[in-house]
Amino acid sequence: MKRLFLFVVTACLYLSVSAQNLVPITWTAFGLTFDAPKGILVEEDTEDTFLLNNARFYISLQSLDSEDMTKDDLPKLVKGLADDDEVQQQTEVKTFDLEQFHGVWLKGIAEVDPCYYACLMTKDAGSVYYISIIYNRVEDKVVERILKSFKMEE
């Protein structure tokens, strides 16, 4: 009976740490909507930057100059941004497509915390956004859900 109780308590603790409720949030300057952790605080919402923060996540979005840029430039761009920030243990760059975006990401370690660095390019207008998500105590799948939820408001 003690083992069962201990197992249930351990499972509940694990689920509370790994489960993350996500809700839509919008960067108003660009009408860029994505799923973010419920209750996360918006630190900055300007035309240059959108910053979100809570105990588990630090999410930063920036609009980049995309003149003459193509989707083939995205892997080199995200790698360069990660190198500039001295991200360690970088994975290979992975590509993904969303309904309105071409995207790339890589994972690594920013100082001591795991992170994802990503770039999204709109398929129609060619706008480019840089996203960094630094996190702790959550699974990579939660971060990937966030990255795969981006869309432009119609």
Positions of the model-derived regions?
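Secretory pathway targeting signatures of secreted, lumenal, and periplasmic proteins
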Residues: 30-76, 109, 113
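Short, surface-exposed coil-to-beta transition loops
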Residues: 44-47, 112-119, 130, 142-145
